[in-house]
Amino acid sequence: MKSMNIAASSELVSRLSSHRRVVALGDTDFTDVAAVVITAADSRSGILALLKRTGFHLPVFLYSEHAVELPAGVTAVINGNEQQWLELESAACQYEENFLPPFYDTLTQYVEMGNSTFACPGHQHGAFFKKHPAGRHFYDFFGENVFRADMCNADVKLGDLLIHEGSAKDAQKFAAKVFHADKTYFVLNGTSAANKVVTNALLTRGDLVLFDRNNHKSNHHGALIQAGATPVYLEASRNPFGFIGGIDAHCFNEEYLRQQIRDVAPEKAELPRPFRLAIIQLGTYDGTVYNARQVIDTVGHLCDYILFDSAWVGYEQFIPMMADSSPLLLELNENDPGIFVTQSVHKQQAGFSQTSQIHKKDNHIRGQARFCPHKRLNNAFMLHASTSPFYPLFAALDVNAKIHEGESGRRLWAECVELGIESRKAILARCKLFRPFIPPVVDGKLWQDYPTSVLASDRRFFSFEPGAKWHGFEGYAADQYFVDPCKLLLTTPGINAETGEYSDFGVPATILAHYLRENGIVPEKCDLNSILFLLTPAESHEKLAQLVAMLAQFEQHIEDDSPLAEVLPSVYNKYPVRYRDYTLRQLCQEMHDLYVSFDVKDLQKAMFRQQSFPSVVMNPQDAHSAYIRGEVELVRIRDAEGRIAAEGALPYPPGVLCVVPGEVWGGAVQRYFLALEEGVNLLPGFSPELQGVYSETDADGMKRLYGYVLK
């Protein structure tokens, strides 16, 4: 490995004797240095506080030719003699030996050994790829080390990723310590797999699972289709803009839940703990974050375990104002439920795509019959894990834990939160149509008029006050939910926030999203009149300034009613006949009118309200089995009313099922998909991705949606 640099005061750069490159303090962010040398004047300038705030624990030396008192935070004083240069080098070497986390450290050392391998993978460190022009290009594009680090588990030096031995075990123990879990398991095929591991380890046919209707489809797959458990659904909120909200407060009432049990499994209604598992989204896709303490205090005594699906959060414990939402920071006792937390590290933490982790916090119920031991969980883990893991994915999870250790993690997320606040302020200052989804006024003062440091430290500035017009969510209790400060959520015109009704003109968010992509900016998702941008410590002022500028530019196009060919050339050129001579406002109006004609915002809301849930007539596992046996037929969604769904159906994103296998098509769900069908035909170029329903072109050239139902 290449030696790291030494950072030094500019006046010392030329005086330091080292084989290492010496860089000035102002020319580094300290991620590439192994030691720091400062002057006495530097020690009084704030550099020591800056170094402490990094959380990197760098050795710091004070250079002085005179006797000085050793300041706090300084390792030693040096004056330039040879022995002291050796001490500096020794400290730098020791830092290099210790700053990497366990698995990644072992991996880099193993790669540097350059072993000759006759084991898989067959590309043999990339050599196979380099024997063909396409392969050579592939190799050069990704770089040498990714191929050298892709190796077989035939060599045991790196430990075992399936039974958790060696440095692999050390890495997961380290992550558990950082994230305050009892055990942590690294998962290399996403939180979809992580959720299935947990649900397969805990649930069997006949078990009751308390089920957030907002849950990602992977929870349906693991808990309902694979395990065959019986769900008790919790209704959830949608607001008129299309944002995904949280579970209604009344759903956390014990008597209410016992009545729901009487409807599906009356024999279990009076059991002390009727639910083997509750599955709750700790944070929704659209940034509604739960208070974990409230969840456990209200329903925890009814559940053996609670799985907090934290795919869209995971960083809450590193942000002080979000700490109450972290299940892993709670003090639990023998009467509380066991806790599982699944996190999509690749979403907003530092991980390659597909990296996920399972945190297990249940030592407080060890010895009880409901306790899930490691061996049982690992059995489920191995059901879903590959025997040929991609080691760079595992290493990324290891490095992610190291990044979040101690002050480093807190600093990085504090900077992210403050940058997000500054960006919201910039949008409020420059834009008239697009509004950040935050309380417009707090304690009689405009949100943006508070200092950023105040906004970043008090959850009041992100809280959903029950009944407040600005957010439009119903059924919330005080202090139940707040807006994730690391989700930059914007609303677009089309909804009157005071009434929740449609306005005469609107700008559907998908049109804005297309414009941004045309101009090199990729939002995370959009829906109806809402759009989401994920914020992570990777962001920069320049990047977010570009976004704000592009939002303002699009607003100008709206005001000018620019030609569609100019604003969305890709869509226009693909469908020139359909959109000939169209202007931007004309397209916005047509799409908005489509939403209004189907009342899509209310359909979307109704799908997740209990009174509008599709009727359940069959266990989801049984319906899925019938589908696999071919006991189904493909029918038009228009004709599916009263038929039993064989597949779950959803738009993606967000990946939340609207109808579950074993439920009956009809009502709001059917009308919602018919609205989507109308949009596919009326507005080509803006079709959503649909799963569980199929678009087929009929003889008249129109696209129709079909779905499988039981015969």
Question: Predicted regions span which residues?
Answer:
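Non-catalytic terminal extensions of PLP-dependent enzymes
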Residues: 2-4, 12-19, 28-40, 45, ...
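Conserved hydrophobic helix-helix packing surfaces used for dimerization/oligomerization
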Residues: 3-6, 184, 209, 278
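Short strand->helix junction
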Residues: 23, 192, 285-286, 540
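Conserved PLP-enzyme active-site core in the AAT-like
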Residues: 39, 48-52, 56-57, 177, ...
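A short linear hydrophobic-aromatic micro-motif
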Residues: 184-185, 342, 520-524
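Short glycine-rich or small-residue beta-strand-to-loop segments that form or flank ligand, phosphate
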Residues: 185, 278-281, 531-536
